[in-house]
């Protein structure tokens, strides 16, 4: 049986669509069961992690990640494996930032999975950056074990191609 290769743009689209659908479905279901204490704790870990970005302190930000965490910045980037490698990759960028802030618009938690819809703001020396993000977090034993961000395309963005 041959393996089917899926294009990054299709995978990204499905990820964003799925994350958005889950977020909206969970948010709109007034009869949903209350979240458990573990789910509340997992959501708090992610929200505290997002809040820590205002400090730009890589030790503090990294303290929320499991030692063997995996991070994928956007749907088309390769994963970065291990807390030390993740923080090394982010350290240079954060060092150049005059400010950083994650504004969580809404979040949904299901067991160990936390999804958030947020806007990330970064102020650099000569520019201000703003990204609309759907974040996927898998929390185990109070630490973020997996973190993937999916960007929301702008209205005038061109579709991604495989060429």
Positions of the model-derived regions?
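N-terminal secretory signal peptides
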Residues: 1-8, 20
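Non-transmembrane alpha-helical segments in soluble domains
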Residues: 14, 43, 47-50, 62, ...
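C-terminal segment of N-terminal export signals and the immediately downstream linker at the start
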Residues: 27-56
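Short, well-ordered alpha-helical segments enriched in acidic and aromatic residues
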Residues: 56-72
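Twin-arginine (Tat) signal peptide motif
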Residues: 5-14, 28
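A beta-strand edge to alpha-helix "cap/lid" segment located at domain peripheries
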Residues: 15-37, 73, 78, 87-163
């Amino acid at each position: 049986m041959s393996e089917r290769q899926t294009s990054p743009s299709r995978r990204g689209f499905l990820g964003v669509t799925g994350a958005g659908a889950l977020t909206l479905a969970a948010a709109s279901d007034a009869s949903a069961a209350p979240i458990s204490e573990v789910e509340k704790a997992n959501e708090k870990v992610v929200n505290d992690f997002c809040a820590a970005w205002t400090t730009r302190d890589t030790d503090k930000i990294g303290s929320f990640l499991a030692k063997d965490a995996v991070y994928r910045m956007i749907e088309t980037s390769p994963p970065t494996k291990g807390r030390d490698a993740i923080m090394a990759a982010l350290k240079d960028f954060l060092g150049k930032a005059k400010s950083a802030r994650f504004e969580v618009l809404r979040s949904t938690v299901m067991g160990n999975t936390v999804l958030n819809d947020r806007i990330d703001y970064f102020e650099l020396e000569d520019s201000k950056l703003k990204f609309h993000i759907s974040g996927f977090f898998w929390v185990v034993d109070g630490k973020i074990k997996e973190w993937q961000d999916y960007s929301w395309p702008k209205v005038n963005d061109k579709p991604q191609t495989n060429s």
